[in-house]
Amino acid sequence: MSRDDVTIGIDIGTTAVKAVAADDNGRVTARVRIGHQLAVPAPDRLEHDADEAWRRGPLAALDRLVGPDTRALAVAAMVPSLTAVDPAGRPITPGLLYGDARGRVPNASVARAQSVPSVGETAEFLRWTAGQAPDASGYWPAPAVANYALSGEAVIDYATAVTTLPLFDGTGWNATACADCGVTVDRMPRVETFGVGVGQVRGTGAVLAVGAVDALCEQIVAGADRDGDVLVLCGATLIVWTTISAARQVPGLWTIPHTAPGKSQIGGASNAGGLFLNWVDRVIGPGDPALADPRRVPVWLPYIRGERTPLHEPDRRAVLDGVDLSQDAASVRRAAYEASGFVVRQLIELSGAPVARIVAAGGGTRIQPWMQAIADATGRPVEVSRVAEGAALGAAFLGRLAAGLESSIADAARWASTDRIVEPSADWAGPTKERYRRFLALSGSKLA
């Protein structure tokens, strides 16, 4: 072991592969971003060129970051995702992504009453994909494609596998459920515990570690582990988790185990994240949200592709309410960021959990107007994580576990660090509070 040892974490995201090399203190020694196209062939479809995003992107990231001191590598990725592959592990169908209508589950409205993410989306992905490529060698989510390209091991972690329920039943691939989709279990990827070594990265002496779901990787290095800590993940998807000591169910929200022993987290994923904000950027002219008049901002309902928690209504669509001639691009941009902040506040309040602090992580933390809007909408300071590539950093820590450089996932807490604290603005407090009430009423929230 050398003080110069580094591990690499690769995060397959919605719009790019982000990767970092990190030392034993979690200091990023190198980083790279490999962009890829997000295809929207129809309003209710969302897909990748899986070969570009899931195979070539991670290989390019490895090529840019690997060095003689690289001890291990792990991959994080969004869920759910799925493609069919040929005998060489190359994708041969579109890479289907979360929220795509091809994963629409019949009678999915029951998800409103569930306290875990709705099940069956990946099964519907598999049914469609198997119909397109019935003779494929495998049906793999993004991390399996990447891991095979990197090491020849088509492997995913248990957390990713569990999101495919009922295909994976907690102990293995369910032959009946897979057969119902036209697939045999031997064409599904191997499943292992995150943070264990399963192979060697091609052309190197580095260990391939099993990674995890992107949100889980972000969580382990965010330091939001105490009761009342709220973790806001600002990526293409907005994810809000409040740490609680005892699991409980709230209609419309998800409750899942925390990585910290004895803790749970309540909240969920929303479409009021980067996909919505990037769309606003494309259709609205230039304007600095910081220069908007606090009293002259409309209200967005940010549902350009439906909403997940707490509404679970994929057919909802966006609304811009209260627009008048006194407003400009800056006002409309501020309204978009506020909409994201309002969703954060709504998910926190619906949970009924006490709040100690808010920690923001993810690539969106680089966007100061977004962070300011979350602070203003919640009325609380926002602690912004130092490393924006949180999922990649968390994956790098899992690499350290596999390489024997760490002994416990709890040790990842020392990698958590704060870049800055964004305080709510007194000038915006009153108008933002009033717009939040309008947002709740317009969206039909139970809090209205």
Task: Please name every model-derived segment.
Residues 8-9, 104, 108-155, 165-180, ...:
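Active-site core segments that coordinate phosphate-bearing ligands/cofactors
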Residues 30-34, 189, 321, 420:
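Structural signal for short hydrophobic segments within the conserved structured cores
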Residues 34-35, 98, 245:
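A generic structural motif
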